[in-house]
């Protein structure tokens, strides 16, 4: 269910803004998106896992707030590029 250290370092290197960037909002949204994908796959087989479902909703809320921050701070162009790279829908348009 959780992402491995190797996968996390791949995401950090792919979405970082500069070398050594591990905590920017772009990286955080990418890591949250991967965790959301993992939990979604888990819930496909374990439909009654309501504790996991609540955790998924918390992660979705955190990612939405991060995306909202990116859109406000960096503009529509970088926001749209990020959601295209992540493969998620635009929820603000």
Swiss-Prot record:
Q: Identify the Pfam families for this entry.
A: Ribosomal_S15
Cite a single GO BP annotation.
translation
**An example Gene Ontology CC term for this record:** cytosolic small ribosomal subunit
Report the superkingdom from the record.
Answer: Bacteria
Keyword annotations from UniProtKB, A to Z: Ribonucleoprotein, Ribosomal protein, RNA-binding, rRNA-binding
MF terms from GO for this chain are:
rRNA binding; structural constituent of ribosome
According to its UniProt entry, the function of this protein is described as: One of the primary rRNA binding proteins, it binds directly to 16S rRNA where it helps nucleate assembly of the platform of the 30S subunit by binding and bridging several RNA helices of the 16S rRNA. Forms an intersubunit bridge (bridge B4) with the 23S rRNA of the 50S subunit in the ribosome.
What quaternary arrangement does the UniProt entry report? Part of the 30S ribosomal subunit. Forms a bridge to the 50S subunit in the 70S ribosome, contacting the 23S rRNA.
For this chain, the family text in UniProt reads:
Belongs to the universal ribosomal protein uS15 family.
Give the protein's recorded name: Small ribosomal subunit protein uS15
Species source reads Ehrlichia canis (strain Jake)
């Amino acid at each position: 269910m959780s992402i491995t250290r190797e996968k996390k370092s791949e995401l950090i290197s792919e979405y970082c803004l500069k070398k050594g960037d591990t905590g920017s909002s772009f990286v955080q949204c990418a890591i949250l998106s991967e965790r959301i994908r993992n939990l979604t796959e888990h819930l496909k087989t374990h439909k009654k896992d309501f504790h996991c479902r609540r955790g998924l909703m918390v992660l979705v809320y955190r990612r939405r707030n991060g995306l909202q921050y990116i859109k406000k701070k960096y503009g529509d162009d970088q926001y749209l590029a990020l959601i295209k790279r992540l493969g998620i829908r635009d929820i603000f348009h």
